[in-house]
């Protein structure tokens, strides 16, 4: 590239974005403006050298407004102090608060922030550059940031370059050049000088342009980035009218590389363990909350009570970060105040887990006396209602008996049960005893009900939930009955009688999906997803196959996780260890399964790049609505229009 052309390219390159495709058509109600603002002039001029003033002024051909300027306008090098950005009539004025750096190219990437004042037509991909030295750096690096766990495009994430190739640069120094991802996860870092770089992505919570907080989402690339450029040719088309081509012209343009950098964003596991709070909403239960999981339960010592065999301990997450203590003894839960010491593992200033003891005074938000008063008031109110109804009874009508308070039980037993499913009994408090001899599960055989065997056990994650397993014969009818008083709760209430009738689905109501997987690691599993990207089932990949049986008709997606450590779950990354998150791949289509059908799909997990794998139907991060005003009737378009603006370069 000739030196003069290279020097002017970065500044004059705005012409690539200035004259975007525009046409004027006529519809009912008159002409509709689709034309974005056009650049007229600027101070300094585009590509100016040796510029040393902090103010930038850009003028357009019409009145303009700015859409989310602090979010959409990206300035390189990044500014520590927030610049002042405002629109004034036909001008955009930016005043930098930081001192200008010597021999540095400054780039202002406006994205689609500049819009005409009336219709909101955006001037897309507009950027502006000047240099404080005698050279204007003009190369660019582009790519995509995806959520490493689910390949969702990450919007609004900062992406930056470091010429300092040391690992510590990301954690100690601000980025040298930056870009920001759009709604498709795409980014472009402009005004880059020749050289070698490391590239990172960062959700910059403290706005210091460095990875300084463990809660920040990050991404890093294992490879060194070396920007380059090449000349390419493309065809531009001019039109006589909406249907007739005038001329097809080949134009040369400069393309910047790399343009396909892929960054997989993740948040590191936080190992900062500390006690968060104690809570006692009701007299019978108090809870301890910690900021992170622990391998062991805290050691609890009662100071105004005996803690031995005093509680039923519930761990709803199974990870010891939330612990519920159900108090067994009525004398104990009648106390308004429970004083105790707890010893637990705490993360010290050296990031080491050490024992720590805190003293707590856990007060009941609802005291026992107040609870009993509320119950008595509710009972008296109910009694008054009963007295009113009694007075209205007609001769011969029988008064309803006073209701008995039973242990609350929620029974999951759908009327049409899946052949692989099971029944569930959920309680509002721990269970003290269960008499399974009072449980009766029967199958209808030739019009007669016959007892069938079942397994009944407590759920492994929830001590207040119990599951009943049996072999359901497809298409057959069942009844499940529990005698009254078969179950006693921790606080003395008994269950009412239970009766549920249901029928197992027929095999022809199901379909199957079989994946023949190519390219997966030796340890991998596939998650079957619903239309909202939620996991329905998980199966391991065995001999290159992942099979899903007994599926209800519907739409399904699938993702594969290369399970590097073989623990059966997706694992995040760690920057200090230079460990990337485990790889995730999506089957690139949503499958529609019909009843009584089998689908066999060949799946080469690397056939498409990661940014093209996840089906749009499963994405939660949708592309922003195109703000360009589309012609409402292409057949009525009048006059000549250029479908291609003849841009001289691309990113």
Q: What are these regions, as identified by a protein language model?
A:
Residues 2-651:
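N-terminal targeting or signal-anchor segments and their processing/structural boundaries
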């Amino acid at each position: 590239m000739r030196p003069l052309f290279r020097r002017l390219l970065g500044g004059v390159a705005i012409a690539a974005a200035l004259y975007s495709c525009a046409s004027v058509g006529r519809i009912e109600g008159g002409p509709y403006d689709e034309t974005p603002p056009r650049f007229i002039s600027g101070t300094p001029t585009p590509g100016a050298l040796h510029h040393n003033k902090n103010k930038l002024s850009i003028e357009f051909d019409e009145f303009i407004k700015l859409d989310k300027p602090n979010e959409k306008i990206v300035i390189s090098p990044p500014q520590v102090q927030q610049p002042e950005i405002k629109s004034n009539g036909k001008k955009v004025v930016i005043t930098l608060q930081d001192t200008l750096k010597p021999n540095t190219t400054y780039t202002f990437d406006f994205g689609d922030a500049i819009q005409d004042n009336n219709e909101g037509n955006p001037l897309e991909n507009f950027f502006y550059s000047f240099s404080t030295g005698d050279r204007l750096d003009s190369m660019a690096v582009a790519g995509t940031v995806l959520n490493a766990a689910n390949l969702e495009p990450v919007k609004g994430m900062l992406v930056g370059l470091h010429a300092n190739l040391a690992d510590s640069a990301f954690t100690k120094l601000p980025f040298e050049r930056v870009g920001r991802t759009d709604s498709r996860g795409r980014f472009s870092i402009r005004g880059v000088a020749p050289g070698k770089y490391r590239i990172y992505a960062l959700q910059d919570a403290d706005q210091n342009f460095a990875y300084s907080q463990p809660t920040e989402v990050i991404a890093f690339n294992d490879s060194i980035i070396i920007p380059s450029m090449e000349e390419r040719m493309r065809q531009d088309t001019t039109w006589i009218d909406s249907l007739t081509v005038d001329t097809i012209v080949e134009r040369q343009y400069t393309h910047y590389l790399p343009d396909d950098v892929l960054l997989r964003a993740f948040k590191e596991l936080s190992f900062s363990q500390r006690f968060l709070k104690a809570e006692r909403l009701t007299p019978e239960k108090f809870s301890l909350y910690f900021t992170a999981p622990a391998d062991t339960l805290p050691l609890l010592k009662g100071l105004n009570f005996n803690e031995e065999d005093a509680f039923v301990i519930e761990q709803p997450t199974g990870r010891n970060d939330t612990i519920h203590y159900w108090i067994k003894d009525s004398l104990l839960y009648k106390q308004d105040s429970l004083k105790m010491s707890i010893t637990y593992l705490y993360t010290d200033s050296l990031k080491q887990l050490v024992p720590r003891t805190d003293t707590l005074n856990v007060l009941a938000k609802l005291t026992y006396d107040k609870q009993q008063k509320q119950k008595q008031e509710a009972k008296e109110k109910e009694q008054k209602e009963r007295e009113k109804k009694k007075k209205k009874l007609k001769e011969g009508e029988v008064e309803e008996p006073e209701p008995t308070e039973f242990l609350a039980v929620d029974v999951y037993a759908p009327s049409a049960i899946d052949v692989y499913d099971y029944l569930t009994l959920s309680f509002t408090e721990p269970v003290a005893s269960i008499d399974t001899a009072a449980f009766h599960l029967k199958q209808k055989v030739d019009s007669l009900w016959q007892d069938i065997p079942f397994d009944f056990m407590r759920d492994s994650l929830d001590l207040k939930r119990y599951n009943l397993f049996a072999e359901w014969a497809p298409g057959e009818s069942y009844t499940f009955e529990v005698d009254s008083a078969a179950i006693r709760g921790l606080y003395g209430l008994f269950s009412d009688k239970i009766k549920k009738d249901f029928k197992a689905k027929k095999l022809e109501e199901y379909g199957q999906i079989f994946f023949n997987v190519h390219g997966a690691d030796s340890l991998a599993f596939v998650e079957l997803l619903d239309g909202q990207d939620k996991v329905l089932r998980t199966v391991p990949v065995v001999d290159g196959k992942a099979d899903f049986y007994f599926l209800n008709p519907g739409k399904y997606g699938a993702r594969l996780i290369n399970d590097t450590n073989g623990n059966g779950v997706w694992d995040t990354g760690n920057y200090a260890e230079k460990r990337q998150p485990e790889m995730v791949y999506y089957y690139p289509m949503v499958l529609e399964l019909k009843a009584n059908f089998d689908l066999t799909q060949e799946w080469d997990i690397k056939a498409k790049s990661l940014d093209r794998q996840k089906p749009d139907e499963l994405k939660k991060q949708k592309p922003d609505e195109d703000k360009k005003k589309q012609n409402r009737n292409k057949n009525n378009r009048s006059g000549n229009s250029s479908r291609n603006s003849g841009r001289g370069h691309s990113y």
